[in-house]
Amino acid sequence: MTTSASEILSHFQEYLNAEHDLREEIRIVVRDLEQTVREIQTSLQPIHQPAQTANYLSFCENALSMFHKIQEHYKQLSSKIPLNQYYRFNDHWRFVTQRVVYMCALIIYLKEERLVSREEVADMIGVQVNREDGFHIDLDDYLMGILNLTNELSRLAMNAVTAGDYSRPLRISQFIGELDAGFREL
């Protein structure tokens, strides 16, 4: 029995169509996640206004109140990714996840002036820490998000001086110095 090339290749076409559909579903969820991230970033921008230094905690609480949406988006993503296929598709959400980590780190820094742990970030966004446990926060994404925090803190230090808060830049400098030392050990 002979099968034609078109019959053989039609099975591949079905596979390619299914993968295209899955990637499109993932893109839709990631697009919604990106929109939520923009909303949260916008809610945190007033920290740079000189008159708002006393309101850091309220901005953080407002931003945290929107994290349930982030958790829902990651839950949707997790449900769409086939078992053991995380790294096949993670290029879709890698950069937005780095921004989410940065926002988590900024919020924790503003509230407590300390570095957020990978476990805390995973808990805040509703994912796992370890790959073996399922949809997780990749170590590289965590580290890149933390690096992005330094840019925002540099901006915050300059704005703090403008607002007359001369101790904040010193604390930020010490924190970034400790962060730098930690990254040098990696």
Model-based region annotation:
Residues M1-S78:
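Leu/Val/Ala/Ile-rich N-terminal alpha-helices, chiefly Sec-type signal peptides and the beginnings
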Residues T3-S10, V101, I107-N148, N159, ...:
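Intrinsic, low-complexity N-terminal interaction/targeting segments
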Residues H11, Y15, L106, L179:
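Residues that form generic nucleotide/phosphate-binding pockets
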Residues E14, A18-D32, A51-N62, Q85-F95, ...:
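Non-transmembrane, amphipathic alpha-helical segments
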Residues V30, E34-V37, L143, L147-S154, ...:
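Hydrophobic faces of stable alpha-helices that mediate helix-helix packing
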Residues V37, Q41-L44, F67, Q71-Y74, ...:
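A structural signal for well-ordered alpha-helices, especially hydrophobic packing surfaces
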Residues Y56-E132:
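Long, charged all-alpha helical bundle/coiled-coil segments in cytosolic proteins
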Residues T162-L186:
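Long amphipathic all-alpha helical oligomerization modules
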